[in-house]
Amino acid sequence: CKLGKKALIVTGQSMIKQGHMAALTDILEDNGIEYVIDSKISGEPTDVMISEGAKMYTDNNCDFLIGFGGGSPLDSAKAIGVLVTGGVENISDYNGKFITKPIPPLAAIPSTAGTGSEVTKFTAIADTRNQIKMLLKGDVLIPVIAIVDSQFTMNAPKSVTAATGLDALTHAVEAYTSRLATPQTDLYAISAIKKIFKYLPKAYMDGKDIEAREAMSVAAYEAGICINNSSVTLVHGMSRPIGALFHVPHGISNAMLLKSCLSYALSGAYERFAILGRETGVASHIDSDETAAHKFLDGISAVSYTHLTLPTIA
């Protein structure tokens, strides 16, 4: 389907430097689609970046959006869409509100395996005036098209691979242990967690491992579908303020909190955590639920803090 005649491509400088942008723009040109590029998205997106992107969209008479890059460009494209159709001056005016007005058509092309923003109804933007990280949500924020091609993740550095992979793991574990979990989200969550346990260390050690990169891209996609339906829990609730106040990348703040927050939640969901322990193979069927649950948390620690050497809250 044709989304429009002129696109605003929301991205970061890394996509241009790595040569990925040419692959996208060549296809647009071959199909007679005009475009302008907003490549100012860096780090955690802010309300200022969103306002600048919205101005570029309207000044150039664009009629659809392409988010191309990691979670930040994808989230930014969603927020720009909200701003250009909402009639307000700053995206922070939407803080705490459910977005219901349709945004322009959005295609999402992730270059990391983490946020799952290509399929979610969420966008996280920093409010620079109030020093908070806003979470905006609404079904209208789900991209019309998601193009998940692991080739775009092959050049991600180890630090990004680790941080984004732990974000996907956090999504899946929190979705599975959420009170809003459903049989459908359970299937996607278990599938994502098993992939991440197996393939994230491999993708981290060898970024050119095609099988590992593909598996991680699918896992992030699956975990994104999960949180659309069963949401997240304590880790994300605590990590957003850390990101806003100390400008810590989202995946890193999740990793810092992951074991401590899940340990706190463990006693209320031994059976759920035990199932994850057995499904990932770190616990056996002869283990009690309590033992299997603790073994699962030990497995998370092995992946997060041993294989990937990510920081803990301590």
Region locations from a protein language model:
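Glycine-rich phosphate/pyrophosphate-binding beta-alpha loops
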Residues: 114, 221, 225-234, 239-248
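Glycine/threonine-rich beta-strand-loop-alpha-helix active-site module
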Residues: 48-55, 59-150
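A structural-propensity feature for long, helix-poor, extended segments
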Residues: 261, 265-304
